[in-house]
Amino acid sequence: MRVPLSWLGEYVDLEPGTTPAEVHAALVSVGLEEEGVHTFGIEGPVVVGEVIDFVEEPQSNGKTIRWCQVRVAAEGQKAADGGADVRGIVCGAGNFFPGDKVVVTLPGAALPGPAPLTPFVIAARKTYGHVSDGMIASARELGLGDDHDGILRLSTLGLDPEVGADAVSLLGLDDTAVEVNVTPDRGYAFSIRGIAREYAHATGAAFRDPAEAVASPPPHAHGFSVAVEDRAPIRDRVGASVFVTRVVRDVDATRPTPPWMVARLKLAGIRSISLVVDITNYVMLELGQPTHGYDLDRLSGGIVVRRAHAGETLVTLDDQTRALHAEDLLITDDSGAIGLAGVMGGASTEIGAGTRNVLVEAANFDPVSIARTARRHKLPSEASKRFERGVDPRVAVAAAARVVQLLEQLAGGTADGLGSLLDETADAEPIRLPDDYIPNLIGVAFTDDEVRGALAEIGGSVSDTEGALLVVPPTWRPDLRDKSDLAEEVARIVGFDRIPSVLPVAPPGRGLSRAQTLRRAVAQTLADNGATEVLAFPFVGAAQNDLFGSPEPGGVPAVKLANPLDATAAYLRTSLLPGLLGIAKRNLARGLVDLSVYETGTVFLPGAALGSETLPPGAALPSRETLAGLNAGIPDQPRHLAGVVLGHTVRKQPGQPAVAAGLADALAMVDQAAAAVGVAVEPVQSRHQALHPGRTAQLVAGDGVRTVLGYAGELSPALAAELDLPRVVAVFELDLDALIAVAPAEIVAGTIAGFPAATQDLSLVVGDEVPAGEVLRAVREGAGALLEDIRLVDDYRGTGLPDSSKSLTFALRFRADDRTLTAAEASEAKQAGAARAGQLFGAAIRE
């Protein structure tokens, strides 16, 4: 909202010399936001001149210029710049005559330039063979309009000032506007009336309500016919609660808008259109009540406010034919729609140069109806901006009277008794404000006088009841609906600076839940071991869900998006891997060939009830059964952990070959994540439709129940090629919620070993088809309690081995708690482990 200071000063006392910065500071103190300062940007000598004579001189470029003699000061007097009273000025316009009064910018003056903060400085300069000693200005050059084809003739504004008079003050170009940002809940501040009231709150200056400064005669008993026939109100709120009409006859619509009004409208951000339209805009800015003028002679019968009919259209003032929606609120007469209520009028009743009789409308429309209509037709307007935030229903009568007053004063019209008032506004319900509510909420012990004074200052009616105040909010504050709103107003008016800067004390017993702590531990552990955490979009294609969402082919159910960002990714993910593989592909394209990434996030697994219950309309309170059905339809959203490893885990260095990433690295990440929560995870050979048939493992928690947590493996070569990925890409995915569910309540650290360990290697030859993990478990089982740790260190297939067999080498570590083991004891335990593997899988010790 832009507020010209001269206008603001009419309704609140401004101390002489008050600066825009001081006005901004006062308004900021009551919750408005500073945006900027606006001026016309005119400096230096700009005076009224009179054209004495001119000579037209055709030029070689086809243009005709006028070499003018212009009087810029009284005869024999010095001009404002100290020069002669008559100046020779070159002018390219052709719309003026000898004797016309014009605006002359003398050398040394500065006008707004084509670029911000770059003024256009006037100087005497030679052009077209003459020294032009100044410039005759157009309306656009002065910032008063868009007309640049001709110069501004003051007679067209109804002005006949003295030659040499200061044109800046004459045209109101010396005014300044402060701009503030108005929050959506404070629509009343979209007016000079509202801003003046807020300035009075901030400074204590006297406030004069412009709505009370204009006489509002009662409408004629047999006034203009108006009816509201809203048969489909939105949220049970009738589209119009107040509708005021007034009639003004014998209006001269061709009269110019006075320059003071043009200047104020321009500073407020609204361009001048015509006198009648400018008056309605001026009153809207002044009082915050949008008004509209109709050409009375073009109306057919009375006015009816109703919803649009099917197939109905309307040509609006911008000459656009609009197909109307059944929710659109219309202003109609006997001929049909003549305006979109609260948004824009229709072309059929537009005020024009030939208009003689004007019907003035000031109404109060339902904010939701206006907001929906404006958005539906992509037609934001100054009127809709105010209506959708809430307009004072009690100001409509005053606004209509103010428009009538200005039409009489400026357009020569005569007020007619033919008018009407439809008012179905309900009185606001009082809000109960307990005595202890504000200090408990805000933390400041405001006195009773401060609370009462603040509530009265904003226009509230305050009365006493037992243990509380009853407060009736003012009609211009529809945002005040409960006691918390009143508490905020008290804090705002008394001063936010009264609230102490004290950090609240955190209540005991709060903090991270066990699940949150473990999830963070998992993520931190993987990051500590060199992996990078990433976040992928949760939207994927159906084929990706089918491929990774289940080990077996056949597709999986998934949640489809109603309005996807991308038609190729129209489903919520059932696996984290599609997003991670997409991230890997993008990184590879940018030259990052060695990659280890992971993500923790939710996947979406729909149940059978998905979509079985329809969401009720916004205005209806859903039943418990409906809510239960909606809740049942929400997909299950477990948290998963997934990772992708490709390239090399160790790069080639002098004396050290590169180590390629593979399944073992994915399993290592699984072990790291599981160890972070105290769970042992065992890989069990398995199959998955997206993974290499011989390089896939199911991940099982090593507890008594043996819970399946997920899978790991290498992408099938065909899929890797299809995705433009390297041949070997290791992946894993775990149900993180399930992993945490089987985690022990406490991770008990083992005792520190007091005796040395004995280490030995064991190489076993088994068939190719025997999983290494199964052999490892057999050795551990057979070796007994002395075996402290076992790791697979080699998987050899080749020369020296029988066909279809492999050699698995394990590193064994033995230790006893009460003694130092002998080599014989360690060897005996190793042999027992080998024997158990031989018993189960036919394993033989490789010599």
From Swiss-Prot:
Keywords: Aminoacyl-tRNA synthetase, ATP-binding, Cytoplasm, Ligase, Magnesium, Metal-binding, Nucleotide-binding, Protein biosynthesis, RNA-binding, tRNA-binding. It is found in: Cytoplasm. One of its GO terms (biological process) is phenylalanyl-tRNA aminoacylation. It comes from the Bacteria. One of its GO terms (molecular function) is tRNA binding. The keyword Aminoacyl-tRNA synthetase applies. It catalyses: tRNA(Phe) + L-phenylalanine + ATP = L-phenylalanyl-tRNA(Phe) + AMP + diphosphate + H(+). Binds 2 magnesium ions per tetramer. Residues 753-846 form the FDX-ACB domain. Its cofactor is Mg(2+). Mg(2+) binds at residues 479, 485, 488-489. Residues 40-168 form the tRNA-binding domain. Residues 426-501 form the B5 domain. GO terms for cellular component: phenylalanine-tRNA ligase complex. Its EC number is 6.1.1.20. It is an enzyme of class 6 (ligase). Tetramer of two alpha and two beta subunits. Belongs to the phenylalanyl-tRNA synthetase beta subunit family. Type 1 subfamily. This is Phenylalanine--tRNA ligase beta subunit. It comes from Leifsonia xyli subsp. xyli (strain CTCB07). The lineage of its organism: Bacteria, Bacillati, Actinomycetota, Actinomycetes, Micrococcales.
